[in-house]
């Protein structure tokens, strides 16, 4: 019988009658799903599905009909809402079996079985557009009203061990039946239906190499049965836990935090460059206790080579990770790089052999043969994906795989899915169709863009502009609070992504905030090291940070103004470039850098000698960097003029001084933005286009310079000044 709520040790009992009882039946299904997904030990991101057979009014006939509500394809239990569930006429789903039986090419893994997925949309209730899950037949064919299908680590541990069938009886005492591995689809659902018919007293079924499904006629009871199944497996595993001899015991010790970060800061860009032979990848570092216990163990090489078992896992992690035979007690980072390069070559050879051995006549073309998971003794795991969200999910799934192997090895012997079965999931026509339906990636989708000065003005606008194109944005600023505010704005707009993995800063989403003082090399070095740990490397750097300091007419008293102006506006850009150069050269991927100078660099005038000459020097710094960093990095400059809106270079007192200087009427009671607007309008009238210059105008030019659209442009200054003929470059 299910345990009392307070007795659960390995899952969280989260059901609250006071909440659930107030919900309508569909809301109750959503509630149950969210509570299951909220506990990471119950199911992984995007994995598993839930359903309820509910009565609803047919919009055509007005009659009450039975409707299957089931979590749709691509949804996540933790965050799903009503719109994430598909709804289908149950009687039409029942009738589909006769359609299937009429197919000549029916049977397990047949084209006819795959064709049934396309039939689901003909059963849609109320024109619900949500695509149905491949597991829809399973939920339909189980007669009980409520069905949960989950992928808990503890249960998959049993489903992935050598004695999975016998242990099903031992652990659950006949309350769960057992069916061997079958690829999800019509035939697997029919097998479960037949198994339940033959064993009417069971509460659920263990699905070999996959997970489990259970049911009830009450939603709360179904939830509690799910928890009971998982808790019972977890308790059995704990009773047989091998303690210090888990994974055969420890072979290596972990590096200390400082040494590990130093090693990764050099290794990750190199690895990213080697992996990105076709497209770039974003990394996630995992070095928690559980991961280190595995990678440091005696059995890690053997188990890693066996590969993963649950299909949810290896669709992200590939059939196996790349384990590097690194000795943290003896080897240095250069040795690690050599061993990684050798291991990568062997991995790609193995993957190509796997593809050629398992491919069928109609298989899709081989995908990138590079690993998505790298295991390093003493250091941890690095997972890779097309973006931060995907790499975090990949890390999460291999975390799950580690727990599955730990459990299976504790109670029996871990077994992976046979290579052909794994291939038939990885290269399944239905999975390929999903990939083909995915929208095209945005221009900067696989890029890491560091925007220095992102706390306000041009920098903030630039951070927003590149984020809109899919970039992973590092909002760096002298004022960390301002940087955090910009990063939060981006996260609020674009989300944190999915996946619940990553250690420290590498658990971040697509936008982070970091503090930096570009006049101090050690802070620049530390900031860029954090970027590497967060994302695996750096692609573009945009420096918008700058300083304008009012100076007196006595030149002899302006030494400090001169020193600070050149320190920020010139030396700062040089320090950033010289530190980024180390990463770019280790990475070996094309990149770009943009310095923000000024049209003042081209116009001689009175009253801003230090600022103007520093910006002129910055223009030539850009040209020198373009030569020095070629051909790997394109370096260009953005030259704004009179960007008043939102700029910390135009504080209220400077704006008032300028308004007074130009005899522009204003009131002391006006807001700073109102005063800035008046000054901007005045400046606009001095330009050829007669339009105020905004931070967004500058951001558009900065984006253009890093987008790849000007890939053959380097060493150039792009003026965004509305047309100041005095500043025309000659």
Which residues fall in each region the model found?
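Glycine-rich flexible loops
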Residues: 1-449, 461
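Short C-terminal tail/terminal secondary-structure segment
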Residues: 546, 703, 714-730
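Substrate-binding pocket helix/loop in short-chain dehydrogenase/reductase
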Residues: 552-563, 683
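Active-site loop immediately N-terminal to the catalytic Tyr-X3-Lys motif
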Residues: 554, 603-609, 690
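Active-site helix of classical SDR
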Residues: 577, 614
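Residue(s) in the substrate-gating loop at a strand-loop-helix junction
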Residues: 598
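Short, small/polar-rich loop/turn modules that mediate ligand/substrate recognition or access, typified
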Residues: 630-634, 713-715
């Amino acid at each position: 019988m299910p345990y009392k709520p307070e007795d659960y040790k390995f899952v969280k009992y989260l059901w609250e009658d006071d909440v659930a009882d107030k919900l309508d039946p569909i809301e109750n299904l959503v509630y149950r799903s969210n509570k299951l997904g909220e506990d990471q030990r119950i199911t992984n991101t995007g994995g598993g599905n839930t359903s309820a057979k509910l009565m609803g009014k047919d919009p055509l006939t007005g009659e009450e009909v039975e409707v299957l509500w089931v979590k749709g394809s691509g949804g996540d239990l933790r965050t799903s809402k009503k719109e994430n569930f598909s709804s289908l006429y149950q009687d039409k789903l029942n009738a589909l079996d006769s359609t299937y039986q009429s197919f000549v090419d029916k049977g397990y893994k047949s084209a006819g079985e795959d064709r049934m997925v396309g039939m689901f949309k003909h059963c849609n209730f109320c024109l619900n557009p949500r695509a149905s899950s491949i597991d829809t037949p399973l939920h339909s064919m189980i007669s009980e009203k409520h069905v949960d299908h989950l992928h808990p680590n503890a249960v998959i541990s049993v489903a992935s061990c050598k004695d999975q069938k016998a242990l099903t009886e031992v652990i659950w005492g006949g309350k769960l039946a057992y069916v061997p591995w079958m690829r999800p689809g019509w035939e697997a659902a029919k097998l479960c239906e037949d198994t339940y018919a033959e064993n009417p007293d069971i509460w659920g079924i263990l699905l070999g190499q996959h997970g489990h499904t259970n049911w009830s006629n009450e939603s709360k009871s179904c939830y509690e049965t799910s928890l009971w199944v998982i808790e019972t497996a977890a308790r059995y595993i704990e009773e047989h836990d091998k303690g210090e001899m888990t994974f055969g015991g420890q072979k290596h010790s972990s590096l200390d935090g400082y040494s590990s970060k130093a090693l990764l800061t050099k290794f990750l860009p190199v690895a990213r460059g080697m992996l990105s032979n076709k497209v770039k990848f974003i990394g996630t570092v995992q070095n928690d206790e559980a991961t280190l216990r595995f990678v440091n163990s005696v059995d890690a090489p053997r188990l890693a080579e066996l590969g993963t078992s649950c299909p949810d896992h290896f669709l992200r992690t590939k059939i196996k990770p790349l384990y590097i035979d690194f000795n943290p007690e003896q080897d240095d980072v250069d040795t690690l790089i050599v061993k990684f390069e050798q291991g990568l070559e062997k991995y790609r050879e193995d993957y190509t052999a796997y593809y050629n051995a398992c491919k069928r006549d109609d298989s899709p073309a081989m995908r990138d043969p590079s690993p998505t998971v790298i295991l390093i003794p003493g250091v941890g795991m690095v997972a890779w994906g097309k973006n931060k969200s995907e790499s975090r999910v990949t890390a999460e799934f291999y975390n799950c795989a580690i727990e599955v192997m730990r459990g299976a090895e504790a109670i029996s012997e871990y077994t992976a899915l046979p290579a052909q079965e794994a291939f038939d999931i990885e290269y399944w026509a239905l999975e390929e169709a999903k990939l083909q339906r995915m929208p095209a990636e945005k221009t900067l989708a696989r890029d890491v863009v560091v925007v220095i000065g992102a706390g306000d003005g041009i920098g903030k606008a630039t951070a927003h502009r590149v984020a809109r194109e899919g970039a992973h944005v590092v909002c760096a600023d002298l004022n960390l609070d301002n940087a955090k505010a910009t990063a939060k704005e981006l996260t609020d707009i674009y989300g944190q992504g999915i996946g619940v993995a990553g250690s420290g800063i590498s658990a971040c989403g697509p936008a982070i905030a970091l503090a930096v003082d570009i006049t101090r090399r050690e802070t620049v070095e530390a900031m860029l090291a954090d970027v590497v740990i967060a994302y695996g490397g750096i692609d573009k750097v945009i420096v918008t940070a700058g300083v304008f300091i009012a100076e007196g007419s006595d030149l002899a008293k302006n030494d400090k103004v001169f020193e600070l102006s050149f320190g920020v506006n010139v030396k700062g850009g040089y320090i950033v470039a010289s530190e980024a150069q180390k990463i770019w050269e280790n990475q070996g991927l094309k990149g770009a850098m943009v310095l923000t100078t000024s049209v003042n660099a081209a116009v001689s005038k009175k009253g801003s000698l230090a600022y103007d000459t520093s910006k002129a020097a910055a223009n030539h710094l850009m040209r020198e960097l373009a030569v020095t960093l070629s051909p790997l990095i394109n370096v260009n400059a953005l030259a704004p003029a009179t960007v008043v809106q939102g700029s910390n270079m135009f504080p209220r007192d400077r704006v008032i001084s300028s308004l007074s200087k130009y005899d522009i009427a204003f009131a002391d009671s006006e807001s700073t933005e109102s005063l800035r607007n008046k000054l901007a309008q005045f400046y606009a009238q001095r330009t050829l286009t007669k339009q105020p210059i905004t931070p967004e105008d500058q951001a558009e030019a900065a984006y253009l310079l890093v987008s790849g659209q000007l890939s053959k442009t380097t060493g150039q200054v792009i003026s965004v000044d509305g047309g100041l003929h005095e500043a025309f470059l000659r």
